[in-house]
């Protein structure tokens, strides 16, 4: 639903879509359909856990800026954290094992990788929708997200 909202804004502001967007979008939606057939339990998620939203204070760590919070696959937050903190494959595995409290199943690993794609797909659209207000910087941000999403798409 959020992707469609950003797509509508991109059209409204007459920002150019990515040249291969139609094909890439179809592949992303096919993966999304495959994931949704397994019906991962939705839980309350932050949906924007970039490093700047983690604040240390009073001997604890707080997660702030909950404007995008909602029900989602928990793998979204874990995938987003991995992307934003530039985790290696080893750190990804440690993160998942710590979160789950056990070894990761193939299905869970697939969901994690798929959510990395979904995260960058959505933020690449957000960036494009912000181009009229952020210019070249937003265009570069959008392309960085889109290209990384395509790299991850080629691995799945």
What function would you assign to each model-found segment?
Residues 1-47, 57-58:
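An alpha-helical support segment within catalytic cores of ATP-dependent transferases
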Residues 3-16, 121-139, 143:
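A glycine-centered beta->alpha junction motif in the catalytic cores
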Residues 44, 62-65:
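Pre-DFG segment of protein kinase catalytic domains
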Residues 53-62:
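Conserved protein kinase catalytic/activation segment
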Residues 75-104, 117-135, 148:
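Active-site activation/catalytic loop segments of kinase-like enzymes and analogous catalytic loops
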Residues 110, 114-118:
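Start-of-helix signal in alpha-solenoid helical-repeat scaffolds, especially tetratricopeptide repeats
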Residues 149-156:
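Regulatory N- and C-terminal appendages and interdomain linkers associated
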